[in-house]
Amino acid sequence: MSVQPVAVYALKVPAGGALIPAVPDAAAMFRVSMAAIDPDEEPDFDGHDTNQRPRATLRIVRAPPGLDLEDDSDDDYEDVDSDEESDDEEPNGGPSDKEKARKLKELAALKEMEEAMDEDDEDEDEDEDGEFDLKAAISKLVKGKGPATDSDEDDEEDEGLELDEMVVCTLDTEKNLQQPLDITVSEDERVFFKVTGTHTVYLTGNYVMPIDPHFHGEDEDEEDEDDYDLSPDEDELALDLMGDDDNESDELDGLENPRITEVDSDEEPPKLVDTKGKNKRSAPADEEKPAKQANGEESLSKKQQKKLKKNNGDAAAVEQKKEAKEGKEAKKVQFAKNLEQGPTPSGQDKKPAEQTTGTLGVKEVKGVKIDDKKLGKGPAAKAGNTVAMRYIGKLEDGKVFDANKKGKPFTFKLGKGEVIKGWDIGVAGMAVGGERRISIPPHLAYGKKALPGIPGNSKLIFDVKLLEIK
């Protein structure tokens, strides 16, 4: 099951063996990713040999299955609901009251458990078996009863209450100051932590929320360019489809009788001449062709006669016009005789496509492996630019530890040390719309330092997309 982190989880478990609830109300799902001790903390040798090396052992304690608050909470809720229906002055009601009733019950049970544990500490001489008292206290907490008593302990012993207690890790001040963990506790699961030894253990992680992989919104059919879900298989398929589209334009080259054929020639293409006037239509062919007079001389068309009048009767201008017309006919493209194929656009009508930036493929830059999946367009990102990114961060085993796929994009100033060095190297040279995979070695990422979800000396892999350059 995939989960998404939503908030930071932190818990302090002091030494001494006291049971600490993982969460106060057990109404949230969380994941523990790190356990650590403070090396500067003074060790607590109470009951321990001072000659031994200071250390702390973390244990997780789970209540037996079947002992939960759901049944009692439902009964309590029905009682509260019936009271509210009889009270006309109460304005509020509905599902939220059930949660309030359960939280109040759990807080009262926690307080009773603490009081029971305090009584056990004061009465250590009379009862040396403190673990059994803790079991009774937990039973009261889970079932929502009063403080643990001797008679209750007998009842619990008869019922055979057994706690699942497991060792998680042992930390010391010399070699093992911290330990990466991956423990996920589901909602409503009753879990406790306790520490035996000389140091307090600090637990960190995230509250998480399950992700339903089968959920599809109504607006998913609409394409959103800012949404980013880079899957290597889908990207490679998209590149293949783009390559097929490019090849389709070459199929026109196989026509037997094209209307326009290219001629290899060193002649320069004719220059376009601006014409004045609103009437841009070409004159009919019969008007352009001068008819021969009876004496063998060519007669001027009406259009040519008008031009002759504008030139004050200068006949030399007509001759120059004829020579210019003959020069236009010597074009770089020749028309075929068979025009049955219909009109086709000439090469001059095609608009030049916007140039892409970079080249596809894998390359290595300053120790960072870069695999361009899609080339962007426009200027390339350089040091000093502020860039807006979408990204998915993974470990080598494919486990996702961070992502920005929707909402506000991640922005930073390139080359200024605002991100890990591998990002400054890997994002440089991208253009808007470009997508690439960046493989960053540990020394250009977080090195030996371990972070939540990222063990020390980890190689990081990022699938990134550049949305904007400022």
Curated annotation (Swiss-Prot):
Gene3D superfamilies: 3.10.50.40, Nucleoplasmin core domain (2.60.120.340). It is found in: Nucleus. The keyword S-adenosyl-L-methionine does not apply. The keyword Isomerase applies. Its main location: nucleus. Residues 40-101, 114-163, 210-358 are annotated as: Disordered. Residues 68-91, 115-131, 150-163, 218-254 have a biased composition (Acidic residues). One of its GO terms (cellular component) is chromatin. It catalyses: [protein]-peptidylproline (omega=180) = [protein]-peptidylproline (omega=0). InterPro entries: NPL, PPIase_dom_sf, PPIase_FKBP_dom, PPIase_Fpr3/Fpr4-like. Residues 384-470 form the PPIase FKBP-type domain. Keywords: Chaperone, Isomerase, Nucleus, Rotamase. Disulfide bonds: none annotated. Coiled coil: none annotated. Inhibited by both FK506 and rapamycin. Binds to histones H3 and H4. PPIase that acts as a histone chaperone. Histone proline isomerase that increases the rate of cis-trans isomerization at prolines on the histone H3 N-terminal tail. Proline isomerization influences H3 methylation thereby regulating gene expression. This is FK506-binding protein 4.
